[in-house]
Each structure stands twice: as C-alpha cells, then as structure tokens.
Amino acid sequence: MRFVRTYFSGFDLTLAVTATLLSLSGLVTMYSYADDNSYFHKQVIWLVCAVIGMVVASIPDYRFLRSGPSAFLAYLTSILLLLLVSAVGEVTLGAQSRINLWFFSLQPADPAKLALIIVLAKYFSKRHMEIAHFRHILVSGLYTAIIFILVFIQPDFGSALIIFGIWFGMVLVSGISLRHLALVVGLGALTFLLLWSVALKDYQKERISTFLNPLADRQGAGYNAYQSTIAVGSGQILGKGIGFGTQSKLQFL
C-alpha cells in the first residue's frame, strides 16, 4: 500500500485521463465500423500491454536520464535500428520501415521519436541559460536531421514530418528569440521547397495537396476525407449511435 500511495502521489491524473479517453474513443470507433472484430480484439490486447508498459516505465525516477549516458544511448540505439531497417526491413505500403519479429512488426521510427524527445530534453535542460545562442539550435537540429533523413529515405514522409515537428515544438518552448524563430521558419520553408522540387515523389505531393484541400478530388485522393466529413456531419451533435453510422455500415469508409 505504501508503494501505491507513493506511486500515485506524483501521478499526472490529467494526462492519464486524457490518454484513457482517447484510447476508449478509438476502441469504440473501431468496434462500430468493423464487421470483423479481430482488429478490435487485437487493439484491446495491445492497449492492455501499453498500460502495463506505462506503469512499469513510470516507476523509476525519469531524472536519471538527465545525468549519465542513458539519453544518448537511447538516441544511438534508435539510429542503429533505423540503419538496420534499411538493410533487412520489410516493405509495407511502399516503405521499407518495419522489422518483422516473430510476434509483432517493429517500426523503428516510433521509438526514434521518443529517443529524440529524450536527448533534446536533456540537451536543452543543460543549456537553458544559453539557448539564445543560435549554435544550440543548430546542434539540436543536427540531432534531429540524422533521424529525419534516415526516416525520410525509407520513405516515410509522415513520420519524418512528425520528427521535424517534435524538434520545432521543443525549440519553440525552449525560449528561442523571435529573430532566431524567424530564421528557423525561413530555413524550414526553404528546405520544404527543396524537398518538394527534388525529393518528394508524386504520391507524397498528392497527400500534402489533399491534406490542404481534401475536397478537391472527392473521388480520388480526397475520397476518405470526403466520406469522413459526411460521416461526422450526418451524425450532427448527438450522433447516430454506435454501429449505426451509414458511411461505415455501407462500407464507404
């Protein structure tokens, strides 16, 4: 009982409730649209595993990551996994992004995001008084660029964008000056234009265009977004009830 009281004394209840509500809403959505509930059952199992993993990971004091090599080792391990997937990974939906293990498929880009957050948090926390110096933004950007490039060449443009967003968000809250922020935004815009011109494939450009204007091609690239809009709108405020959505039951989604 003492351990339980100690554990929950520092528990972030808001974060736990938010994550629980998001998870439950996802399960309800999956249960309502799927005729085959095998995916729903698998998701429940993985959710239970995730909760157990969260509890175990939250027991040690996270501040040990601030001292010692743990943060950098996590970062280095993520890079090695990304290099490994480029050599022996299986191709799924056009991207060589997964390592097939005997009981599940590992996507190294996911733990790489967590490792990047940890190493950047350690870097910024040790230099919070010097963050106004642009060199720290460049060094943190180099940490990010290595993972970004390894993920981008898989090619997994979606995960690469999330990795960039992690870095940009952490730089933004670290106390960056407006002048440096404007410079970062400008460099980001130039990098995006360069990627658009020489690196992005046609289907990746199509996804970006569809995200910006999902209704421009209702029968093509924007089909799912259009049908989702109908599904949400047809339910109005109270919804149609679990299992009674027309777009899901008639297999428009």
Give the residues covered by each predicted segment.
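TM-adjacent membrane-interface loops and short helices in multi-pass inner/ER membrane proteins
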Residues: 210-253
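N-terminal membrane topogenic signal
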Residues: 1-19
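Hydrophobic alpha-helical transmembrane segments of multi-pass inner membrane proteins, especially
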Residues: 16-24, 28-226
